[in-house]
Amino acid sequence: MTTVIQRRSTSNVWEQFCEWVTSTDNRLYIGWFGVLMIPTLLTATTCFIIAFIGAPPVDIDGIREPVSGSLLYGNNIISGAVVPSSAAIGLHFYPIWEAASLDEWLYNGGPYQLIVLHFLIGVFCYMGREWELSYRLGMRPWIAVAYSAPVAAATAVFLIYPIGQGSFSDGMPLGISGTFNFMLVFQAEHNILMHPFHQLGVAGVFGGALFSAMHGSLVTSSLIRETSEEESQNLGYKFGQEEETYNIVAAHGYFGRLIFQYASFNNSRSLHFFLAAWPVIGIWFTALGISIMAFNLNGFNFNQSIVDSNGRVVGTWADVLNRANLGMEVMHERNAHNFPLDLAAVEVAPAVRG
């Protein structure tokens, strides 16, 4: 008879839990950031789905005129949204237990705060989890750094902007048409299109899309032939193979002749760093711009029209933008005030006749 003697495990439940959380052998890495990320994102997602489907109207402007955003109250997928918290709540922290009843909490838009704050904690932890997994695997930390761009953008529109404006009611609604409404109102009140940081963000996003398409098409066009005409070219690559799957010299030569020599990268590492850095830096600047405009340091304005020697207005594109901004501002919160602030606070300026 054979007797097998095993050493009894001396680790307790907590040590086993710690080992499981930080193990890179799991199908999905949990990590310490994941311990907080998972419940917060599940909470935000669950509340969003319920609110998008059935939340009652919210008194967003604090003037007893509720706005419906859910599907069961007459909206569709395009027009539906989770409406931001009421202006009557302002920046006050408004959990369920701060309201006198659940009906009051829903009427004042409590679900918006619950969703946004849990969502932000969740995406912060997701970024930390990216860094944590990179650290465990001995990788460099740039994946988390790149992800910081959309995290900064989300933080700017959901947290920094409401803080600067003094109320969560100014945050971005959680829906398709609500997002576009937020963009139009932001342009009307802050002239974001004329802010240099937003312009850098546009260059980052559009430039990143252009560079991604250029890189992908160049690589695909210079693949090393490994298959016949009857086979898919994708079969010519084996996961983990040591040799390069495309000819970077050919791609470099093509692009160098198409534009000029120094427009083409001859170093694969610097090329991919550039592809990552360009859109990330652009989105960083946009998030910074929104955070600046949150405190009303707005984009360039040209409110003083150009006039000739007889006092007649010489129409410019700036006048067109100004009138468009005023029109959008008049439509915004039309029952909360009679005039946009810049119409009510200054003397009537000459307008372009069109």
UniProtKB/Swiss-Prot annotation:
Spans traversing the lipid bilayer: 29-46, 118-133, 142-156, 197-218, 274-288
GO molecular function, a single term: electron transporter, transferring electrons within the cyclic electron transport pathway of photosynthesis activity
GO biological process: photosynthetic electron transport in photosystem II; response to herbicide
Membrane topology: Multi-pass membrane protein
Catalytic activity: 2 a plastoquinone + 4 hnu + 2 H2O = 2 a plastoquinol + O2
PTM section of the record: Tyr-161 forms a radical intermediate that is referred to as redox-active TyrZ, YZ or Y-Z. C-terminally processed by CtpA; processing is essential to allow assembly of the oxygen-evolving complex and thus photosynthetic growth.
Binding of chlorophyll a PD1, residues: H198
Propeptide: 345-354
Record site feature (Tyrosine radical intermediate), residues: Y161
Binding positions for [CaMn4O5] cluster per the UniProt entry: D170, E189, H332, E333, D342, A344
Chain positions recorded as pheophytin a binding sites: Y126
Positions contributing to Fe cation binding: H215, H272
Binding locations of a quinone: H215, S264, F265
Gene Ontology cellular-component terms listed: photosystem II; plasma membrane-derived thylakoid membrane
Enzyme class name: oxidoreductase
Subunit structure: PSII is composed of 1 copy each of membrane proteins PsbA, PsbB, PsbC, PsbD, PsbE, PsbF, PsbH, PsbI, PsbJ, PsbK, PsbL, PsbM, PsbT, PsbX, PsbY, PsbZ, Psb30/Ycf12, peripheral proteins PsbO, CyanoQ (PsbQ), PsbU, PsbV and a large number of cofactors. It forms dimeric complexes.
Note: Cyanobacteria usually contain more than 2 copies of the psbA gene.
Function: Photosystem II (PSII) is a light-driven water:plastoquinone oxidoreductase that uses light energy to abstract electrons from H(2)O, generating O(2) and a proton gradient subsequently used for ATP formation. It consists of a core antenna complex that captures photons, and an electron transfer chain that converts photonic excitation into a charge separation. The D1/D2 (PsbA/PsbD) reaction center heterodimer binds P680, the primary electron donor of PSII as well as several subsequent electron acceptors.
Protein name: Photosystem II protein D1 2
Biological source species: Synechococcus sp. (strain JA-2-3B'a(2-13)) (Cyanobacteria bacterium Yellowstone B-Prime)
